Amino acid sequence: MARVTVEDCLDHVDNRFELVLVASKRARQLARQGIEPTVEWDNDKPTVVSLREIAEGHVTKDILKQRDQDYQTSSLDLALSANSLNLEGFSFQ
């Protein structure tokens, strides 16, 4: 496994600040959303994998335009769940 440098990533992303945004968003996708990486995982952490993907040109700043999957449960879903479980007196706000 080769080391990833910021300079390698900056060939594909405009500046360091944008690199942080792109890498963190991709790392969250890998860690929380179960999206398959485009490079070998090699027992690395999601942040390292995301930087390797950027350095190899697989992930670009276009990822910032994508909407994140929303894992928050709506109040209606919670209320329906409480109703089906008969949780009387429990309030969802």
From Swiss-Prot:
Q: What is its EC number?
A: 2.7.7.6
Q: Keywords in alphabetical order, please.
A: DNA-directed RNA polymerase, Nucleotidyltransferase, Transcription, Transferase
Q: Name one GO biological process term.
A: DNA-templated transcription
Q: Which reaction does it catalyse?
A: RNA(n) + a ribonucleoside 5'-triphosphate = RNA(n+1) + diphosphate
Q: Where is the signal peptide?
A: none
Q: Which Pfam families match?
A: RNA_pol_Rpb6
Please name the Gene3D superfamilies in this protein's record.
3.90.940.10
Q: Which SMART domains match?
A: RNA_pol_Rpb6
GO MF terms listed in the record are: DNA binding; DNA-directed RNA polymerase activity
GO CC terms on record?
Answer: DNA-directed RNA polymerase complex
As for family, the record states: Belongs to the RNA polymerase subunit omega family.
Q: How does it assemble?
A: The RNAP catalytic core consists of 2 alpha, 1 beta, 1 beta' and 1 omega subunit. When a sigma factor is associated with the core the holoenzyme is formed, which can initiate transcription.
Annotated PANTHER family: DNA-DIRECTED RNA POLYMERASE SUBUNIT OMEGA
Q: What NCBIfam families does the record tag this protein with?
A: rpoZ
Its biological purpose: Promotes RNA polymerase assembly. Latches the N- and C-terminal regions of the beta' subunit thereby facilitating its interaction with the beta and alpha subunits.
Q: Would you tell me the protein name for this molecule?
A: DNA-directed RNA polymerase subunit omega
Q: Which gene encodes it?
A: rpoZ
